[in-house]
Regions:
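Amphipathic alpha-helical interaction segments
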Residues: 19, 40, 90-98, 156-160, ...
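Short linear capping/connector segments at secondary-structure termini
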Residues: 111-121
Length: 192
């Protein structure tokens, strides 16, 4: 097959997968996890059921694929925040702020049933480890630069940041998220 034909087929497959994942996520948001069926997903995505089954065997697989994509997008956003700053302090603040706003946004859109289903997956544990490593490395860099306290091990400071900023999921206003980031950063500064 010519390369152009292969590229077109690959693009079409990606579009069908994306439309399917978006349709399933939208249906869960509207109807709840248990009300979503393959028929409803196919109808919402604008494809036939037979086509849908060529891509995904069940709703759970669709939602796991959607969640995996969301996680990858969030991690990439944090990496971009880190890479967009030029000093250890600025990198740390940028990543903490980005993480807080991701938590704020996703926490307001996850119902508890969906979150319980998605967060039992091993991909979530892997993503948490990547997040932990990213933040720990920034804290270690900040400690070496004198902008992060050294009297507490970086792993403990990482846990502090992640737990503190996860509270942003329950905050209503972006200003409150900004204040939470400032308080978290204040706890990271060297004493004295």
């Amino acid at each position: 097959m010519p390369k152009l034909w292969n590229d077109t087929i690959d693009a079409h497959r990606r579009e069908v997968r994306e439309a399917t994942m978006e349709a399933a996520a939208a249906l869960v948001a509207e109807l709840g996890l248990r009300a979503v069926t393959m028929s409803r997903v196919a109808e919402r995505a604008g494809i036939g059921r037979a086509t849908l089954y060529k891509y995904f065997p069940d709703v759970e697989t669709i939602l796991r694929a959607w969640h995996e994509r969301q996680i990858a997008t969030h991690l990439e956003h944090l990496v971009q925040a880190r890479d967009g700053a030029d000093t250890p302090a600025a990198r740390l603040e940028a990543v903490l702020k980005a993480y807080a706003f991701v938590s704020h946004h996703t926490g307001r859109h996850h119902d508890t049933e969906l979150a319980a289903f998605l967060h039992q997956d091993e991909q979530v544990a892997k993503a948490r480890q990547q997040l932990h490593t990213l933040l720990r490395d920034l804290l270690t860099e900040g400690a070496s630069a004198g902008v992060v306290r050294v009297d507490i091990p970086p792993d403990e400071l990482t846990a502090y940041c992640l737990h503190a900023l996860s509270a942003s999921a329950g905050l209503r206003a972006p200003d409150a998220v900004e204040r939470l980031v400032k308080v978290t950063l204040a706890g990271l500064r060297p004493p004295g």
